């Protein structure tokens, strides 16, 4: 009887341990053995700037404007490339008589740069930068997010994920209208200007330049001009809409 009792008790304890151990998420239970879970925002920020044109990582490379710019140039017939056969030539053209079919990721580089290359990395700069009162980094990250929304809206039209963006609990996402991306662009831009104007906490041009060594070297005034340029472009993109505001275009062009 004692043996059965202790076996039952042991089984119950094992079940309890199993249930409680499963309460942790996978990334909490098994920490990254190769790097600290939390990295300095100064180390993350350079990759956000680099992904303007291109990036490289183990899970995907060449995300940014560079790759898509090459293909857009073919689409608007700025240039083309010619190989030995007509079949190969047709695969490099973007018009009624040619184009990319099948499983190609052509014209997906900007998408990858925004949602993957910047994505959660940019979110962490905003989160950790706020916790550390590095408002210049927060403002810079929001400026890059505004740039991304604008570029996505211009390139992909209504095929953009806005409301569900960066939701790690989803594996399928719903597209949103282009206008929502423009609205999100401006919202991020206005927030960026607010943070770039803050001087308290751990704000320091010297420290901001550590992560911003190759863009504006930590100069928040240049970052503000960058944001004003984004706002001007966002309003200029609506020239064929009833909501077009020429005054806003002129205002932000003068500030940029």
Describe the residue ranges of each PLM region.
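Long, intrinsically disordered, low-complexity segments
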Residues: 2, 19-23, 219-220, 233
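Generic surface-pattern signal
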Residues: 11, 50-57, 127, 194-197
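Helix-centric, low-specificity signal for extended rod-like, repetitive segments
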Residues: 17-18, 67, 138, 226
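Membrane-proximal, proline-rich intrinsically disordered regions
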Residues: 22-80
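Structured, solvent-exposed acidic/aromatic patches
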Residues: 38-42, 81-256
């Amino acid at each position: 009887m004692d043996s059965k009792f202790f076996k039952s008790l042991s089984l119950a304890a094992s079940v309890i341990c199993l249930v409680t151990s499963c309460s942790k998420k996978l990334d909490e239970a098994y920490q990254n053995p190769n790097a600290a879970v939390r990295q300095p925002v100064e180390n993350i920020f350079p990759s956000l700037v680099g992904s303007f044109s291109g990036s490289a990582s183990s899970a995907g490379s060449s995300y940014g404007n560079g790759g898509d710019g090459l293909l857009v140039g073919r689409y608007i017939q700025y240039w083309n490339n010619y190989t030995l056969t007509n079949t190969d030539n047709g695969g490099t053209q973007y018009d009624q008589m040619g184009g990319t079919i099948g499983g190609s990721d052509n014209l997906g580089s900007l998408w990858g740069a925004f949602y993957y290359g910047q994505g959660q990395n940019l979110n962490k700069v905003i989160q950790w930068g706020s916790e550390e009162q590095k408002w210049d980094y927060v403002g810079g990250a929001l400026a890059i997010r505004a740039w991304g929304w604008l570029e996505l809206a211009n390139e992909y039209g209504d095929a953009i994920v806005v409301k569900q963006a960066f939701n790690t609990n989803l594996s399928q996402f719903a597209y949103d209208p282009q206008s929502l991306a423009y609205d999100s662009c401006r919202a991020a831009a206005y927030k960026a200007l607010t943070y770039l104007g803050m001087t308290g906490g751990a704000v320091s041009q010297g420290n901001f330049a550590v992560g911003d060594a190759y863009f504006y070297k930590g100069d928040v005034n240049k970052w503000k001009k960058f944001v004003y340029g984004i706002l001007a472009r966002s309003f200029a993109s609506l020239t064929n809409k009833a909501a077009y505001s020429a005054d806003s275009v002129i205002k932000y062009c003068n500030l940029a």
